[in-house]
C-alpha cells in the first residue's frame, strides 16, 4: 500500500497561521435517539452522569425507564465516556452491564484565507471514538 503522497510536514509547512484561519466543523452525527448520550468536555461530569442515570431510572414524569443507553465519546471525551459508564455500573450493584465499541471518525477542518488572493482549503483528519452500550441485566 505504498502511495506517493507529500509528507505531512511539507503540507503543514505550506499553511502559515497568519494566512489561514482554522475552522473545525462539527463531527457527523447519526440521527439522535432518545437513549443516546453524547459526552463532551464542556458539560459538568456530574450533570452528564445524572442525565444517564435519569434515563435508566425512568425520569421524573413517570416516563418509561430505558433498558439500555448508548454513551458516545469523541477524542478527549473518550475517557469521560468510559468513566461515566463505569460509574453507572458501579452504582447499580450488578444490575447494569457495559459493552464498548471503538471506531475512527473522519473530521473535516476548513482553512479560511485571511486574504482574497488565496483559495479556501479543507483538511481531513481522523479522530478516535467510543460507543458504550449500558444495559440492564435480567436476574436469573
Swiss-Prot record:
GO terms for cellular component: cytoplasm; multimeric ribonuclease P complex; nucleolar ribonuclease P complex; nucleolus; ribonuclease MRP complex. The keyword Cytoplasm applies. InterPro entries: Alba-like_dom_sf, Pop7/Rpp20. GO terms for biological process: rRNA processing; tRNA 5'-leader removal. It is found in: Nucleus, Nucleolus; Cytoplasm; Cytoplasmic granule. Coiled coil: none annotated. Keywords: Cytoplasm, Nucleus, rRNA processing, tRNA processing. Signal peptide: none annotated. GO terms for molecular function: ribonuclease P activity; ribonuclease P RNA binding. Component of ribonuclease P, a ribonucleoprotein complex that generates mature tRNA molecules by cleaving their 5'-ends. Also a component of the MRP ribonuclease complex, which cleaves pre-rRNA sequences. Component of nuclear RNase P and RNase MRP complexes. RNase P consists of a catalytic RNA moiety and 10 different protein chains; POP1, POP4, POP5, POP7, RPP14, RPP21, RPP25, RPP30, RPP38 and RPP40. Within the RNase P complex, POP1, POP7 and RPP25 form the 'finger' subcomplex, POP5, RPP14, RPP40 and homodimeric RPP30 form the 'palm' subcomplex, and RPP21, POP4 and RPP38 form the 'wrist' subcomplex. All subunits of the RNase P complex interact with the catalytic RNA. Several subunits of RNase P are also part of the RNase MRP complex. Belongs to the histone-like Alba family. This is Ribonuclease P protein subunit p20. The lineage of its organism: Eukaryota, Metazoa, Chordata, Craniata, Vertebrata.
Amino acid at each position: 500500500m505504498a502511495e506517493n503522497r507529500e509528507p505531512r510536514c511539507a503540507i503543514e509547512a505550506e499553511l502559515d497561521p497568519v494566512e489561514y484561519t482554522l475552522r473545525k466543523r462539527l463531527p457527523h452525527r447519526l440521527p439522535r435517539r432518545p437513549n443516546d448520550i453524547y459526552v463532551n468536555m464542556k458539560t459538568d461530569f456530574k450533570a452528564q452522569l445524572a442525565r444517564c442515570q435519569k434515563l435508566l431510572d425512568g425520569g421524573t414524569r413517570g416516563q418509561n425507564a430505558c433498558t439500555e443507553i448508548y454513551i458516545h465519546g469523541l477524542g478527549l471525551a473518550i475517557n469521560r465516556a468510559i468513566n461515566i459508564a463505569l460509574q453507572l455500573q458501579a452504582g447499580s450493584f450488578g444490575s447494569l452491564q457495559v459493552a464498548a465499541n471503538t471506531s475512527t471518525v473522519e473530521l473535516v477542518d476548513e482553512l479560511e484565507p485571511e486574504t482574497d488572493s488565496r483559495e479556501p482549503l479543507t483538511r481531513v483528519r481522523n479522530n478516535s471514538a467510543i460507543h458504550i452500550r449500558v444495559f440492564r441485566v435480567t436476574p436469573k
